[in-house]
Each structure stands twice: as C-alpha cells, then as structure tokens.
Amino acid sequence: VYKRQISVSTLLWADLENRFVWIALLGIWLFGLIGWRDDYAKVIKENSTGMSAKRKFQYQSIAAFIIVLLLYATNQSANDTLLIIPFIKPEIFSFDLRTWHLYPIFAYLVIVGTSNAVNLTDGLDGLAIVPVVMISGALIIFSYVTGIEFWSERLLFPHVGGAAELSIFCATIVGAGLGFLWFNTH
C-alpha cells in the first residue's frame, strides 16, 4: 500500500522526464515486491520466518544490480559518481568512483546495506517507518541542495543535474510515512 501512495504522489508532482524519478520509483517497487513476497510467505504459507535470509539477499542483489545498471548507464556527468564529504571542498577531498569501476560496487553496497538497515530497525519496535521518515526528511535537503547549482556551490556539494527532483520523491515518502503512522494510532 505504501509504495502506491509514494508512486501516485511522485507521478503527480515530479518531472516525469527526469531519470532519477523513474529509477527511484523502480527501486521502491522492486524492494516493495521483495517485502510482499516475504509477507506472503509469512501469512499465506503460514511460515513464521518468511523467506530465508539467503533468498532475500538474492532478491535484493538482483534489484540493486538493476538499479545500479540503470544509474551507471544513464550517468551524465562526472559529479554523478563523485564521492565527497559534505561541506568540505571537493578540491580537499573527493574521489571519482568511476576510477577502477568502483561505482557499481559502491552503489550496490549502499542500496543493499540501506535496505537491510531498515529491516534490522524494523525488528526493534515494529514500526520501521519512523527512521525511514527521518532519513527521507534529511534526503529532501541533500537532494535539493545537490540538484540546485546555486545551493550546491555555496554549501560545497557537487552539482548533479536533476537530483533536485528526488526531493519530491523523498517528500512523498515522508508524507506517506506520516499518514501510515497516523493510521496506526487508531
């Protein structure tokens, strides 16, 4: 249900010609399908453990590989693959992940690691949506700053054209997450 609200809101408000928007939507659907498959195994098949960790990791790896492939294939500038420390001049520290083809490996680890981090926090209180809302709120700012040249220059972020549209995607995650929390209070 959650991915539907995010998708509809994103499709209504985001620039649909932006590659990041479509890749983000694909990512949320791929990982949402993995979660659905796990819940299906738990509820319908009455298997309390759901999918095995190995199977989940395999599905996550396939989804991450597809996302990384799309990001790498549509790379438009050197800043798309630049690793930086925020608020530090790129001249002082920056590393182009295209060197030795590290970008696909790094992006894969970030995507799968982030997915599993959310799953690990879910076991703590049953509502993984709270950290998702908080992180998405921060990502609204980072994606906007990175995507707008005026702000990226002043705050020492590399400018990535089109990244500002991801702030809309992240805002839809925050909105859907807050709606989910409100729904669960009753």
Question: Which residue ranges define each predicted feature?
Answer:
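Alpha-helical transmembrane segments and their helix-start/interface "positive-inside/aromatic belt" motifs
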Residues: 51-63, 125-131
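Membrane-interfacial loop-to-helix junctions in multi-pass inner-membrane proteins
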Residues: 17-25, 44-59
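Alpha-helical transmembrane segments within multi-pass membrane transporters and channels
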Residues: 31-41, 45
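Alpha-helical transmembrane segments
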Residues: 3-33, 67-69, 73, 78-83, ...
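Alpha-helical architecture
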Residues: 36-37, 54, 58, 120, ...
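Active-site His/Glu-centered metal-binding helix of metallohydrolases
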Residues: 37, 41, 62, 124
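Membrane interface segments of multi-pass transport proteins and intramembrane proteases
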Residues: 42-52, 86-95
